[in-house]
Amino acid sequence: LETSDCRNLQDIRQYVIARLRRSAYTEEQLDAIADSIVEKSEGVFLYAEFICESIEAGEIDPYEPKEFPSGLYNVYEDYFQRRFPSLDQYNDEVAPLLKLIVAAREPLQLNDLIPYLSYLNKDWDEDFLARIMKQLGSLFRLDDKVIVPFHKSICDWLTRNDDSLYFISRKKGHRSMITWAKLYGHDYSLM
């Protein structure tokens, strides 16, 4: 289905209502919230999923739809602004991890990442990574000791060459991967 197809928009609406029905909203409130999310979603199901998650987490007020970000990339921007208000902390602690993630051809193993990241910053250990992963929230998840973006679009947004304060250079990520490979005797061509 095309994103603008009325069946797609109806699917998004039904999803929002079903997901938020667990909360204490009246049918009228659910309808209004769903209509607002569908309108701002630009037909992107992932947008609706993320907004519902943010509403459930108390990060977005469902009664202020004009405050909802427009489009998926704006969702990511707003999310990062809330999670990383200090750009210094983001650049020092989070960006080095994200550089590796966006440059990798395959999901990265934690036991490979931590030694390299601790080489860059002596504070990096499993507890430090757990804190960073908590801040990243649902955008990146740990699956069996592997870090996985929840959707390709998050890496696309991070690496877009625009004015985002959270921009991650894929080129610098590749340089980090090469340094990592040299330090730990990995074959970069396999990463």
Regions flagged by a language model, labelled:
Residues 1-95, 110-112, 123-126, 143, ...:
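Non-catalytic, charged helical/coil tracts that couple and regulate nucleotide-powered enzyme cores
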Residues 5-9, 105, 154-156:
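Conserved nucleotide-binding/hydrolysis micro-motifs of P-loop NTPases
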Residues 88, 101-106:
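Short helix-capping/hinge SLiMs at alpha-helix to coil transitions
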Residues 117-183:
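C-terminal leucine-rich, beta-strand-based interaction scaffolds used for sensing/assembly
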